[in-house]
Amino acid sequence: MRRPVVKDEIVEFMRHRQEQVTGSLKELENFARKENIPIIPHETVAYFRFLMETIQPKNILEIGAAIGFSALLMAQHAPEAKITTIDRNPEMIGFAKENFAKFDTRQQITLLEGDAVDVLSTLTETYDFVFMDSAKSKYIVFLPEILKHLKVGGVVVLDDIFQGGDIAKDIMEVRRGQRTIYRGLQRLFDATLDNPGLTASLVPLGDGILMLRKNQAEIELPDVD
């Protein structure tokens, strides 16, 4: 994300001081930078590396494959995991297919094509880790279905939820073109941050991460229609 919410010097320290990616991930990182394709920044990469090696999830769902960088990162650090990733952008799907064919050596990753709203309703499996990195205004729309497919004790990570700092402002201070995202994120926070069925944490990495842990089988959420 190009709008970090932490001081620039701290961001630079985190990006340069923590272990760098190598091999296939470095190749994809360089490609994304050259083509100006958003992928998770290095401070988030380091955090994901820690999460994967600590949690060791067995069944991962990702919303937003892009070029496949984050799915391949998770596969590398959770080698026993099966990963299902969803994307609807034809160009990104093309990149992801190429990269999975080249770098997914353990054949851990399955790519599903289509709008997440439609694809989620067809899933029959349960997951212990979900990564959402797609349309921010739709996070609250996707969440009910995500939670249905999440095991008790499972974790959801939602990326880029600070909107470059806009979420801390009054809506009248937010540019008109960003207000739909703003409203969607505020509804997301209202539904999750004080929800007794969830443990929630806001983490200032990149443009912000929301982490959720599912604590009980049934989670009540406000109507999102």
Description of each model-found segment:
Residues 1-131, 136-157, 161-225:
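A short alpha-helical cap/connector motif
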